[in-house]
Structures are given as C-alpha cells and as structure tokens.
Swiss-Prot record:
It comes from the Bacteria. The keyword Nucleotide-binding does not apply. Keywords: DNA-binding, Transcription, Transcription regulation. Disulfide bonds: none annotated. The keyword Transcription regulation applies. PROSITE patterns: HTH_MARR_1, HTH_MARR_2. SUPFAM superfamilies: Winged helix' DNA-binding domain. This is Uncharacterized HTH-type transcriptional regulator SAS2155.
Length: 146
C-alpha cells in the first residue's frame, strides 16, 4: 500500500537522523527532547506549557519535566501572567538564546550536508515540507478530538 510506504519512509529516516544530530546536542549538554522544546519556545515566545504540549503533541507532565531541566540550566525563564495567575509565560534567557543560535547553526550544517549528498531539488523539498505540514495539522487535530 502506497500510504503505508509513505509513512514508513518518514519513520525510517528519524532514527538515523537523531544519531547524526546527537553529537551536536551532546557537545552542548542538551538532550534531543530538550532541544525540541527550546526551539519551540524560541519560535513562539512568549509561550505556555499548554501551547508547547499542543504544538509538540506531548503530554503536559513530559513537557513540565523537560521545562524544569531547561529552567535549572538557566535556558528559559518563567513569568506569571498579569491577567491569569495560573498562566505562566516561557521565554529564552540570554544563555538560552545563545545556545539556540549555536545549535541551530550546527544542525543546519548537518542538514545541508545531508541534502547536498542527495539529488533533491528545492521544489521537491518545498513540496515535501508542504505535505508534511498538512499531515501534521491533521494529526494534531485528530489527537485533540479525543
């Protein structure tokens, strides 16, 4: 079935990609899950735990545990909302922003090196990105309609 092969093709590149990215993250003393949340905060700050768990499709306790580690490492700050004391806004600290920039550059170099070894055109990459974004939206919608 083509749809099964389609999904399996994305699953099969995930682990090898992580293996290539891990040394970059280890060099900066950050785990992949922490990196994904740090990157999410950088792109959407100020943001909240609930927004992160929704965008990343992870459980709130998992996100909370990861956020705790990022706070302890002085990579993010937490500020109470003025309107709703239960709501807390998350932003990068200067140290967190610096780490984000450095890791982004290293990861981009890795990604560019991998793409350079293929014959993938810019148009093919853009089409794949569009399709993956479409699927991501549907999957998020499906997982939040429980």
């Amino acid at each position: 079935m083509l749809s099964q092969e389609f999904f399996n093709s994305f699953i099969t590149i995930y682990r090898p990609y992580l293996k290539l990215a891990e040394p970059i993250l280890e060099k900066h003393n950050i785990y992949y899950g922490q990196w994904l949340i740090l990157r999410d905060i950088a792109k959407h700050q100020p943001t909240t735990l609930i927004e992160i768990s929704h965008r990343r499709a992870i459980e709130k306790p998992t996100a909370r545990k990861t956020l705790k580690a990022l706070i302890e490492n002085d990579l993010i700050t937490v500020e109470n909302s003025l309107e709703d004391k239960r709501q807390k806004f998350l932003t990068l600290t200067p140290k967190g922003h610096e780490l984000y920039e450095i890791v982004c550059l290293d990861v981009q170099k890795l990604q560019q090196a991998v793409v350079a070894k293929t014959n993938i055109s810019q148009d093919q990459m853009q089409e794949t990105i569009n399709v993956m974004n479409q699927i991501h939206k549907i999957l998020l919608k499906e997982t939040h309609n429980d």
